[in-house]
């Protein structure tokens, strides 16, 4: 329920029952043999796990410092780590006897992952999306519809992600007997941050075995980008007790912290309550949630998962920022040096790893969680960079 003082269940009375039911079901099925057999089967044959741990030799040589390894979550079916959690929760919902999935989505990635998992398991899928985002993300809307999902534009409020979340919650309260609300990151009220972390920690478990096989030792540093924080939590969690491994989360510095145009909740936010949890949020003096900015649509979230807030507080993980400009540079660098086009989100982690590697010795090791591929971002990069 709590990560130190962070997390909790700050929700209206009407949500207590569905959350209790979910917690009970998760406790029951998470170690269930048949549930895990099916989950592992789908992760392997449908999602393409395990993903490789790749030594970025040319990038390493170019920088001339620590060895850089990439955990290739960009190779998961669907193109990002989101699939790990979507299939996990969808299968859990199926085991609970639910027939319908709902989710909210901003940039559309989580909506697509939910639609994919729903199609795989034969479940009805409704996706809430701010009307403004529906306009901005036409391809992902089309993708969701192709996968059989129904996309519901939300016209209230700022017509963006936070309004979509409100609508999804309203729906869930009224329909939870047959509906599962599939949250896409390590955020929201308990038990969601724990459930999502557990389904994502397959990343870190694989990476640990793979680096031991490749190098015979654990890495010195693990670097991952942090929006809500699920890809980072997924790779961090299996290493939390390995105190020698430094964990670094990279937030979206946008146009710089002083500009106010960023999404760096842990670096520039305050502790508050939003989305059913106590964590760090970007808020003004009145406690209102501030608008966020990042070149990477998936980092554009005004808060962060409570377990990250806790890891920061106990100083087990360090959180830094990378600007739009630095991320773009890394996006081009990785594409040209290794033949891998990263998502702009992941490019934030690559940028910081490149900076860090320079200051480290050649026998040290960095693992970067390459959380997604960059196909979805080509439009953005084209607009910003003009011709390459």
UniProtKB/Swiss-Prot annotation:
What GO molecular functions are on record for this protein? tryptophan synthase activity
InterPro entries for this protein:
Trp_synth_b_CS, Trp_synth_beta, Trp_synth_beta/beta-like, TrpB-like_PALP, TrpB-like_PALP_sf
Q: Which PROSITE patterns match?
A: TRP_SYNTHASE_BETA (PS00168)
* Modification N6-(pyridoxal phosphate)lysine, positions: 82
Q: Which Pfam families does the UniProt entry name for this protein?
A: PALP
Q: Into which EC class is this enzyme placed?
A: lyase
Q: Which domain of life is it from?
A: Archaea
What Enzyme Commission number does this protein have? 4.2.1.20
On subunit structure and binding partners, the annotation says: Tetramer of two alpha and two beta chains.
Q: Which family does the entry's similarity section mention?
A: Belongs to the TrpB family.
Protein's name according to its UniProt entry: Tryptophan synthase beta chain 1
Gene source species: Pyrococcus furiosus (strain ATCC 43587 / DSM 3638 / JCM 8422 / Vc1)
């Amino acid at each position: 329920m709590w990560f130190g003082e962070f997390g909790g269940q700050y929700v209206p009375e009407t949500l207590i029952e569905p959350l209790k039911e979910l917690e009970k079901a998760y406790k029951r099925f998470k170690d269930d043999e048949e549930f895990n057999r099916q989950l592992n089967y789908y992760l392997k044959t449908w999602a393409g796990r395990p993903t490789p741990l790749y030594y970025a030799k040319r990038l390493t040589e170019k920088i001339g410092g620590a060895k850089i390894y990439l955990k290739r979550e960009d190779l998961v079916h669907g193109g990002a780590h989101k699939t790990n959690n979507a299939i996990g929760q969808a299968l859990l919902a199926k085991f609970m006897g639910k027939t319908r999935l709902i989710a909210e989505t901003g940039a559309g990635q989580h909506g697509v992952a939910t639609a994919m998992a729903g199609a795989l398991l034969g479940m009805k899928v409704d996706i809430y999306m701010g009307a403004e985002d529906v306009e901005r993300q036409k391809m992902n809307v089309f993708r969701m519809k192709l996968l059989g999902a129904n996309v519901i534009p939300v016209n209230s409020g700022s017509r963006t992600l936070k309004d979509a979340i409100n609508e999804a919650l309203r729906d869930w309260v009224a329909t939870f007997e047959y509906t599962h609300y599939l949250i896409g990151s390590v955020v929201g009220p308990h038990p969601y941050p724990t459930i999502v972390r557990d389904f994502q920690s397959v990343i870190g478990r694989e990476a640990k075995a793979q680096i031991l096989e490749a190098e015979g030792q654990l890495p010195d540093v693990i670097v991952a980008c942090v929006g809500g924080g699920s890809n980072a939590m997924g790779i961090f969690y299996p290493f939390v007790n390995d105190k020698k491994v430094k964990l670094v989360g990279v937030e979206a510095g946008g146009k710089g912290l002083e500009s106010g145009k960023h999404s760096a909740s842990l670096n520039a936010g305050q502790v508050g309550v939003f989305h059913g949890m106590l964590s760090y949020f970007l808020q003004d003096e009145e406690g209102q949630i501030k608008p966020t900015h990042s070149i990477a649509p998936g980092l554009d979230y005004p808060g962060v998962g409570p377990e990250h807030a806790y890891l920061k507080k106990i100083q087990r993980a360090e959180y830094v920022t990378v600007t739009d400009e630095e991320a773009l540079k890394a996006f081009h660098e990785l594409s040209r040096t290794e033949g891998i086009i990263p998502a702009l989100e992941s490019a934030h982690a690559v940028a910081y790893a490149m900076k860090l590697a320079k200051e480290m010795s050649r026998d040290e090791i960095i693992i970067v969680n390459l959380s997604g591929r960059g196909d979805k971002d080509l439009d953005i990069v084209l607009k910003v960079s003009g011709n390459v």
